[in-house]
UniProtKB/Swiss-Prot annotation:
Encoding gene per record: fabI
Pathway(s) annotated for this protein in UniProt: Lipid metabolism; fatty acid biosynthesis
Binding-site list for NAD(+): 13, 19-20, 40, 66-67, 94, 166, 195-199
Species lineage: Bacteria, Pseudomonadati, Pseudomonadota, Gammaproteobacteria, Pseudomonadales
Reaction catalysed by this enzyme: a 2,3-saturated acyl-[ACP] + NAD(+) = a (2E)-enoyl-[ACP] + NADH + H(+)
EC number(s) reported in the record: 1.3.1.9
UniProt enzyme class: oxidoreductase
Protein name per Swiss-Prot or TrEMBL: Enoyl-[acyl-carrier-protein] reductase [NADH] FabI
Annotated binding of substrate, by residue: 97
Gene Ontology molecular function, alphabetical: enoyl-[acyl-carrier-protein] reductase (NADH) activity; identical protein binding
Record keywords: Fatty acid biosynthesis, Fatty acid metabolism, Lipid biosynthesis, Lipid metabolism, NAD, Oxidoreductase
Single GO biological process annotation from the record: fatty acid elongation
Matches recorded under PANTHER family: ENOYL-[ACYL-CARRIER-PROTEIN] REDUCTASE (PTHR43159), ENOYL-[ACYL-CARRIER-PROTEIN] REDUCTASE [NADH], CHLOROPLASTIC (PTHR43159:SF2)
Subunit details: Homotetramer.
Site features described as Involved in acyl-ACP binding, chain residue numbers: 204, 207-208
């Protein structure tokens, strides 16, 4: 019996088998959780439903949801409530900024509209999901989980306004933890090392970032979606019942280093 047996989880943000959300879904399924999913638009519906079936779910537990639209978020929980009488876990794996914001000098390329979009989709949407799912999760010792990156606290080439949005997201983790803790709901984030996903492909020179990270991380390798998925499943389980408001780094130790190995090491 897995450590998530009996838990019900809504996973928001599965886009491909290579996405971090997929790694989390696979780990949660392995550990016995019952899963529901959202998809952004009709173009992704068939793909997400196919993935869901592989993780023990079914099409009626896959719901349309553009996280920029509060009415769609509320509709997800209204529909989910017809199938489940409660919810234990929400996984938020959503991040977006216009492509022109992720290419070039931060001061030069950042715009008011790009800033707004990045924060709305990448940070506020987590709060919106928590707000809409609050009643279904109340009193169940449940967990909210989101995904961040070290660019929230350190500058990264071309990450630009997404770094600011992730910083906002991490602050949201702490404030949500304070807001929902008395109801038994924990809130945490996994800060993953760079992984080749669809979202990451929009960042200029991402392959160079991967190579640099591999050289400089203590483990001398990049992490996988399976490793991030395992950490996410743990944080959402009763094994982590005393952890809330935290950012868990799954980056091979990169966040602990000030200087990577020298060329002659």
């Amino acid at each position: 019996m897995g450590f998530l047996t009996g838990k019900r989880a809504l996973i928001v943000g599965v886009a491909s088998k290579l996405s971090i959300a997929s790694g989390i879904a696979a780990a949660m399924h392995r550990e016995g959780a019952e899963l529901a999913f959202t998809y952004q638009n009709d173009k992704l519906r068939g793909r997400v439903e196919e993935f869901a079936s592989g993780w023990g779910s079914r099409p009626e537990l896959c719901f349309p949801c553009d996280v920029a639209d509060d009415s769609q978020i509320e509709a997800v929980f209204a529909a989910l409530g017809k199938h489940w009488d409660g919810l234990d876990i929400i996984v938020h794996s959503v991040g977006f900024a216009p492509g022109d914001q992720l290419d070039g000098d931060f001061t030069a390329v950042t715009t008011r509209e790009g800033f707004r979009i990045a924060h709305d989709i990448s940070a506020y949407s987590f709060i919106a999901l928590a707000k809409a799912g609050r009643e279904m999760m109340k009193g169940r010792n449940g967990s909210l989980l989101t995904l961040s990156y070290l660019g929230a606290e350190r500058t990264m080439p071309n990450y630009n306004v997404m770094g600011m949005a992730k910083a906002s997201l991490e602050a949201g983790v702490r404030y949500l933890a304070g807001s929902l803790g008395a109801e038994g709901t924990r809130v945490n984030a996994v800060s993953a090392g760079p992984i080749r996903t669809l979202a990451a492909s929009g960042i200029k020179s991402f392959r160079k970032m991967l190579a640099a990270n591999e050289r400089q991380t203590p483990l001398r390798r990049n992490v996988t979606i399976e490793e991030v998925g395992n950490a996410g499943a743990f944080l959402c389980s009763d094994l982590a019942s005393g952890i809330s408001g935290e950012i868990l780094y799954v980056d091979g130790g990169f966040n602990t280093t000030a200087m990577g190995p020298l060329d002659d090491d």
